[in-house]
Amino acid sequence: MVVLSKLVSSILFVSLVSAGVIEERQAASINQAFTSHGKKYFGTASDQALLQKSQNEAIVRKDFGQLTPENSMKWDATEPSQGRFNFAGADFLVNYAKQNGKKVRGHTLVWHSQLPSWVSAISDKNTLTSVLKNHITTVMTRYKGQIYAWDVVNEIFNEDGSLRDSVFSRVLGEDFVRIAFETARSVDPSAKLYINDYNLDSASYGKTQGMVRYVKKWLAAGIPIDGIGTQTHLGALTALASSGVSEVAITELDIAGASSQDYVNVVKACLDVPKCVGITVWGVSDRDSWRSGSSPLLFDSNYQPKAAYNAIIAAL
């Protein structure tokens, strides 16, 4: 037991030293600098395993004001078999966020990917409607009042701006969007409800134009869409904001090579668009990135801040 006690003490000492080195090195906080300009948050994506890494957690706690669950709130994680829900990973992240004063963006309720086969196999309209409503209601009820915003539907457009083929669009047509948003609004009226997508980098691109066109139509029909989430730059961000939503956010930012200028341009784009409320980078360290080979994040594989990190701080 004495040996074990010494081992635990040593681990704790190393963790505290690591955290201390990180905090000493990072005199500024991106979140504090960003929110000083009137924005709501500068956040990151994470999950339980990453938050249990001491170096990663120290950076999250020090530098970021918002968390998006990378995988733990997706359908295959929360409802892998019909009616049997698992909230262990999502609970951990939400509890951590509450304890450390971080906002949470729920990600994601309706997505064609990471979808259990039992959902993909549904071909009956009434069955899918019931399943969709039950899933959204169960997940959102658990975290009611604890989530700043939800990505209600995710990546539903093709590159030409048409609706993507999925079990939802095949069986329900575009009405699945109405069903999803109306259900979400009824469960948690205080949460901001988002439609989220990628490759919305140009105002003239077909996908961007399709997003704006559909959102305008859905808003006119009374569908309660509050925001559009994207990884984008100024021209497209302005176009998305003009769709009639009350806010937009940059939700899944990572840039291959982590160009300082590209990162600064994105930050400035959000600062320049009044409706842009926040930025979320998709991870902390290149070590844990889903595309680590392209070194896309603000911290390298040794948890050291990169040039892009320092450039953002300087720009703010």
UniProtKB/Swiss-Prot annotation:
Biological-process GO terms, alphabetical: xylan catabolic process
Keyword Transferase: no
Pfam family of the protein (one): Glyco_hydro_10
Keyword Secreted applies: yes
EC number: 3.2.1.8
Annotated disulfide bonds: C270-C276
Domain of life: Eukaryota
Annotated function: Endo-1,4-beta-xylanase involved in the hydrolysis of xylan, a major structural heterogeneous polysaccharide found in plant biomass representing the second most abundant polysaccharide in the biosphere, after cellulose.
Entry-linked SMART domains: Glyco_10
Induction remark: Expressed in presence of xylan and repressed by glucose.
InterPro entries, alphabetized: GH10, GH10_dom, Glycoside_hydrolase_SF
A molecular function (GO) term: endo-1,4-beta-xylanase activity
UniProt-recorded name of the protein: Probable endo-1,4-beta-xylanase C
Key words of the record: Carbohydrate metabolism, Disulfide bond, Glycosidase, Hydrolase, Polysaccharide degradation, Secreted, Signal, Xylan degradation
Reaction catalysed by this enzyme: Endohydrolysis of (1->4)-beta-D-xylosidic linkages in xylans
Record domain GH10: where: 44-315
One GO CC annotation: extracellular region
Pathway linked to the protein: Glycan degradation; xylan degradation
